[in-house]
Each structure stands twice: as C-alpha cells, then as structure tokens.
Amino acid sequence: LFPYTTLFRSRAEVADVANAIYDGTDAIMLSGETAAGKYPVDALKMMADIAEMTEPHLDYKVFIEHRSMDGREKISSAVALATVRTAKNLKANAIVTPTMSGNTARLISNFRPKVPIYAITPNSTIQHKLQLIWGVTPLKGYQRDTTDHIMSQAMNVVRSRHLIHKGDLVVFTAGDPATNMTNGRGAVTNMMHVIEAE
C-alpha cells in the first residue's frame, strides 16, 4: 500500500488503509516493493498503527444489520448470523465451531461478533488459513464422529487451553454430520447449541 522511498505517508495512503478496515477486510499487507524497500519495518508499523487507530471507530452493529448473507450459502449464512445474534443477546463468552473447511468460522467472522471465535479443526492447512480471518482463533483438534462426540471434543480443546471456564456460556455451531447435506450442494452449517461450560 505504501511507496518505499519515503517515511512520510500521504493522506491518500492513510485513507486507503483506514478504508480497508472500514470495509471489513480481514488482513492488510504491504506490497512487494514496500517490503523490500528502504523502510519496510517503519511502513509495517505505520500500517498497523493506522489499523489499530481505525478499528475502535467501527460500528459493529453495521456488520450484523447490513452484511448480506452469501447467496450460495444462505443456510450456513443464516445459521452464522443467528449464532452471532445469540452470542450478543445472551452475552456469551465465546463462539466455538468445529470445522473441516473453515467456512463456518469465516461466515461467523463476517458479522464481526464481539466475542472470540474458536475454530476447531483436525486439518493443519485449514488451521493456518484461519489465522488470517478476523476474530478467529484456530485450534487443532477433534475427529469426524457423531455430533455429540464432535461437540464434546471441541469443548475439551477450548477448555484444555483455558479459553473458557466453568459457567461460561458458549454458542456452539457446526454442520450436523447426520443431516447437513442439502440438495446435493454439500455440507452446510445447520445447527446451533448454547452450552454452559462445566
């Protein structure tokens, strides 16, 4: 985003970074020229400072009220939106989602919940990709199994890392392996549970 020949930033460059944040971008990055230029560390620090100064001014209600649901994935998007609204209404401590593809965590992130999103996946590649998604903490764990076992395994992962504690309210969402194939379109996120951590 920044030119590499000067330490000073123009108003347009600052606005580009701020607008990316206002647009809900999950990650921003420097161009190759900047990263290899005279001041790569200073440019990165400046970009991070702009992002950190911009984020507190976002109206997160806008993300819930005005983000449209993905047309290809209306069922999953509707469940993701319901998950975020439920977490807000109940003042939940976290959202937990076991995921094979990372899609559920990405959909939930689109609505910018104020609670952490813990995405539990057995797939290392998906875990690494989810590190770039806003608000998502990807964790390794769980194996394909019945819905009850997947929920139990995912809760054990977040509990063992002390991310949730006894009495915390957790909104749990995933695709139920027994019922999540819809009209030949593949797996969808189709369930949500509210659980009090034991």
Each predicted region: which residue ranges?
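C-terminal helical cap(s) of enzyme catalytic domains, especially alpha/beta-barrels
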Residues: T34-P56, R185-I195
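Glycine-rich phosphate-binding active-site loops on the catalytic face of alpha/beta enzymes
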Residues: V17-P40
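Beta-strand/loop-dominated core regions that host nucleotide or nucleotide-derived cofactor-binding catalytic loops
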Residues: T137-K140, S152, N156, A178-M181, ...
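Generic secondary-structure signature for well-ordered alpha-helical cores
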Residues: Y22-A27, A48-Y60, V84, K88-A92, ...
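Long, charged amphipathic helices and adjacent flexible linkers at domain junctions
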Residues: M46-V84, M191
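Nucleotide-binding motor/catalytic cores of P-loop/tubulin-like NTPases across gene-expression machines
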Residues: T104-R106, R112-H149
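Short, small-residue-biased leader/transition segments that mark boundaries at the very start
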Residues: L1-F2, T6-L7
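Conserved, mostly hydrophobic/aromatic
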Residues: A20, I108, V170
